[in-house]
Each structure stands twice: as structure tokens, then as C-alpha cells.
Amino acid sequence: MQAPPQEEKPKPKILFMGPKRSGKSSIHRVVFQKMSPHETMFLGTTPDLEIKLVSHNEYVKFQIWDFPGDYDGGKLMIQGEEVDESLIFRGMAVLVLVVDAQEDPVEEALGGLLNIIKNAYAVNPMLNFEIFIHKIDGDIYLTDEPKEDCLRTVQTYIARNVSTDIRVRYHLTSIYDHSIFDGMSKVVQLLIPLQLPALENMLNALISNCMMEKSFLFDVTSRVYIATDLNPVHMATYELCCDMIDVAIDVSCIYGGADEDGKESDKLAYDNQSASIFRLSNGTVLYLRQVGSYLALVCLMQASHFNDKEGLIEYNVNCFRETLQMVFQPLQRRKKGERLAASAGRS
């Protein structure tokens, strides 16, 4: 006798919406599917709803729903069935609204999004709204002043037309730099509201006890940081940490890319033993350590502090790794129980 199959818990969902050619599809393809930014120039418009599963690590798994740019509300066909938009908004965790910053005037791109915001909030008041002011990479955005002007324009327009009860955050993004990864990092963090405060407290304690300057918990595959300490995130520091991950993986591919049988492996060269220490010419040390399945702790500190506290750092990082498993332990225990229940029903 075989037990009925266990239904998997629905994954949290991130919904992308915005006008045609605003860059919705380019964003998630660059961040989560490793597409080169230049390749996105050849992407066509999204004719139908696209659903992608992101499951790079064992702790944070979610779906991306990419809506066609000409969607103007009402019903939508999903896998051959007509579904009302209220059901869609009710099941979402985050709604990402993408605005083309190169649209002139930018208010024209915002007009169609207001109804979406109001309709979604009416159905799901707990929904998080994230506005990506995208494509800030044109000739008119070579300095910070026009970027800030565009941000101010969007914020003012939204504030005048929607309720103050609606939670809206704004991000200036481009697929040609790390700003899009920083923006998506803050979106992904909304999917773990129960665990995020604990992770941030752990990272705060780590940098305080080890005299570090900054720390990130990275999803290695996407370069999205799942958590960071409460010190401000400087883009140069974030880019440096991302570059370190790239170099560490590239070196692992060259010198450690074989499996147990001695054959070349096509999997990402990153495992439970992965660790790297980079010493920069300016006296800074970058420290990378694997702490979970495709999860890496990356820290930045002064070389003098690292030399004095290397043993303490190793000990505290090991404690962090063990505690990380405990933070997500209820989730892992439930999944293990489901697997045991399924196997116990077989005879």
C-alpha cells in the first residue's frame, strides 16, 4: 500500500508588473538566470504570464510571476484556466512594479500602475509594494542629481494618488550594474519575515565580536544577499563582495571541478568545504565561508583585525553556521517529517 503523495507547501510568490519594454523580464533573467545584460536586448515582449521557480538554496525558495506588459486588469489565463486577478493578488507576497526611468515624462508610465496598486491593496492589504525605477543607465543619468530628481518625481506622484496606508518602497535600478541585485536582495528578504530579524542580529553580533566592517549572507548562485548587518550597504563594498564570489568560484572550477569519480562536473564549483580569504593592497581582508547549501557568509575587515582574531573569527563563523540551521530548523523539521511520513506509508 502506498500513501497518497504529500502536497508541497506553496512557494511564496513575487509578482512583476509594468508597461511593455519597461524591463521586467530582463530583471529576473539577469539576476536569477545568469543572462548577460547585453543579451536582454534581444528579448521580445512577454506575450503571456511566465512563472519561474527559484530554488538556489534550501532555505529561500519562491516563484516569480512575470505579467505581460499589456495586462490592464481583470481575468487572466493561467495554464488554460481563466483566473480572476483578485485570486492572484491574494496569493502574492511582493508586487514589484517596474517603471522605465527613460520614459519622458515618467508620469505617463506611472498612470497605468496606480489602478494596479489600488486593486491589489483592496484584495491583499498585507502585500508589499516595491517600485523599481529602472534603466537609470542612459546618458541623462550619468550623475546622481538626475537620478534623485527622477526618484523624487515618482515618490511625489505615488504619494499624491494612493493611500498612506499602502507600504511602498522605491529602488533605483539598472541591469548594467549591481543596483538591480541590491534591489532584488531587499525584495527577497521580504519572503523570510520570521527569520530575517534573527539573521540580522546574528550578523550584528558577528561583526561586533570580530571587529568586522560589513557582513553579508549571500545566495551564491544569484549574488542576492539574504541578510546583512545594520551598517549601511555601500555599493562599492557590495560589488567587491560579489566579485570575490565570482573569483572564488572561477578558481574552484579550474582546480576543483571534478566529482568523486574524477570526471568533470558541470555543477557549480561550490560545496560544504568552500572558503576563501582575499587580502587587498589597501589593507582590507575579504573572508568567504560556506554556511549552507549554496549560501556563503562574506565579511569585510581590516587586515590587522583579521591577523589578531583569526582563531576567534573561525570559531564565531562556525557558531553562525550552526545557529543558521537552527533559525530555519522548524521548516527543515517539517519537511523531514513529511518525507518520513511518505516513506512509512509504502510497503
PLM features: what roles do these ranges have?
Residues M1-P19, T46, E50-L53, T156-A159, ...:
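Short, flexible boundary segments at extreme N-termini or domain junctions of P-loop NTPases and their
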Residues P12-M35:
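Glycine-rich phosphate-binding P-loop
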Residues M126-F129, G138-K214, V233-T237, D243, ...:
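Canonical P-loop GTPase G-domain recognition
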Residues L199, P232-L286:
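A charged amphipathic helix-loop-strand protein-protein interaction module that recurs
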Residues S215-T221:
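Short hydrophobic alpha-helical segments used for membrane anchoring or interfacial signaling
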